Amino acid sequence: MNLKVDIFIPCLVDQYYPDVANNMIKVLERLGCDVQYNVEQTCCGRIAFEDGYWDHCKEVGEKLIMELQHERYIVCPGAACAATVKCQYPALFHNSSLHNQYKSVQKNMFELSDFLVNVMNASDIGARYNSKAVMFDACKAVHELKIKQAPRLLLSKVRELTLIETPSTYSCCGMSGGLDRNNEKLSVDIGSKIIQDFIDAGADTIISTDMDCLMHFDSIIKKNNLPIKVAHLAEVLAAGWN
């Protein structure tokens, strides 16, 4: 297969976790995709939208739409930003001068695991990752994009990986909707409780589709020297290939 795909890299990944983007590209190329990346690509406007600055979100959203209007699949290593385009952009661009372009980008935008499982029909990427891990569901993934089983299917095929489920895998990490900015103590308390639940269950790794959640967990883990680490789904899927 030689499927040409665009990639959309969230700001957080671009600026702080470029290895996540690189690992996603490796996975896509392993499956035969011809990956395209526009170096002028910027932000989807998610934080501005969540904080009520819809005009600012629309301004950067217009730029993103024009950069991605190629009528090919767009793959994003983060459900939160993919959900902004698929679920929030209608409030900004429906019946606007960019209506047709936004509908095209909305239709073609996929979070990584959703794309791999439901478009590429992939499950076993050939990965090997020695760990007892939890798959943490990002709020946007579950509630807006309805993504829950796709990452678990992919992880179930990873050699030497044992998945552990606890009630906390379905909880908010504590930073959603700007809680980390508006109530830091509560945000940290929520994150700390979840991490401890994972440790008590025997997990040594927290895996997620979203670096937003993982960054929040990682800051708590490092500050308190806790015996657990974080890993983006793309990192796990790109690990241990023969």
Q: Where is each model-derived feature located?
A:
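Iron-sulfur cluster-binding electron-transfer modules in prokaryotic oxidoreductases
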Residues: 1-242
